[in-house]
Structures are given as C-alpha cells and as structure tokens.
C-alpha cells in the first residue's frame, strides 16, 4: 500500500459523517511521504520543533506548535508519543512512529476525540509494522 493510500483511506476517512480537514505522513527528517491536498506548507524548523518536543516533552508548550500559517496551543498529549494542539474550534494531533509523524488537522464539526482516534489508530498500526 502506498503512503498516499494511507492518507487518503485511513486519515481522510469519514467518521460519523465528518473527516479531517487535512492530513499527512512526514518522515522524522521533515520530508513529506504523503499528504492531503489541503495540508499546509510548513517550514523545516516547524517539523524540527515538533520532533524536539517528542525528545524533550514540554518544549512546545511555552511557544506553541506552528504548522504553516497556524499556531496551535499545545494541550495534554502523551509525552514522547502524541502531541495535541488546539486553535479555536479546531486542532491538530501528531503521532510519532519509529520513522514518521502521522499528522491530522481538524475543524468543527469533527471533534478532538475523533481526530485523535483516526491519527493514533494509524500511528499505532505503523508502530506495530516497525515503521
């Protein structure tokens, strides 16, 4: 299965009539493996900061998680495994696997819990596969 198929069929899937606004799978080096059409352009240092927060939990809390034009307030995740962010009625979930970051961005009416479920389910699967 291609990385784009994982994004299209597993991250952008419909959950209770809703789906993520955008999603991507990005390598730890910041290279995009696959992304949805609406996924924001980001700066390399934004991905570097996300990786740094996985290595040093709490790093992003005082500065926020930036991805493209959006700044998310970092909320409780799972140190070293999941980062969650909030911006107005939407937010972001980032799950770290052995080789990649699985990223989902949502807006209402999708809920944070639905976004977490979609992103973490694929991330957990990739971890089980050694990826």
From Swiss-Prot:
Its main location: cytoplasm. The variability of the residues taking part of IgE-binding epitopes might be responsible of the difference in cross-reactivity among olive pollen cultivars, and between distantly related pollen species, leading to a variable range of allergy reactions among atopic patients. PANTHER family: PROFILIN, PROFILIN-A. Pfam families: Profilin. GO terms for biological process: nuclear migration; regulation of actin cytoskeleton organization. This is Profilin-3. Occurs in many kinds of cells as a complex with monomeric actin in a 1:1 ratio. It comes from Zea mays. A motif (Involved in PIP2 interaction) lies at residues 81-97. Phosphorylated by MAP kinases. Binds to actin and affects the structure of the cytoskeleton. At high concentrations, profilin prevents the polymerization of actin, whereas it enhances it at low concentrations. By binding to PIP2, it inhibits the formation of IP3 and DG. Keywords: Actin-binding, Allergen, Cytoplasm, Cytoskeleton, Disulfide bond, Phosphoprotein. Disulfide bonds join 13-115. The modification Phosphothreonine is found at residue 111. InterPro entries: PFN, PFN_euk, PFN_sf, Profilin_CS. It is found in: Cytoplasm, Cytoskeleton. GO terms for cellular component: cell cortex; cytoskeleton. The gene is PRO3. One of its GO terms (molecular function) is proline-rich region binding. Pollen specific. Belongs to the profilin family.
């Amino acid at each position: 299965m291609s990385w784009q198929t994982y994004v299209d069929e597993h991250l952008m899937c419909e959950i209770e009539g809703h789906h993520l606004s955008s999603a991507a799978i990005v390598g730890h080096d910041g290279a995009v493996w696959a992304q949805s059409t609406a996924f924001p352009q980001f700066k390399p240092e934004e991905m570097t900061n996300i990786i740094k927060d996985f290595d040093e939990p709490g790093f992003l809390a005082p500065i926020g998680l930036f991805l493209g034009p959006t700044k998310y307030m970092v909320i409780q995740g799972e140190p070293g495994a999941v980062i969650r962010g909030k911006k107005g009625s939407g937010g972001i979930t980032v799950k770290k696997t052995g080789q990649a970051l699985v990223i989902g961005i949502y807006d209402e009416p999708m809920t944070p819990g639905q976004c977490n479920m979609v992103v973490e389910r694929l991330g957990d699967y990739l971890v089980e596969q050694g990826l």
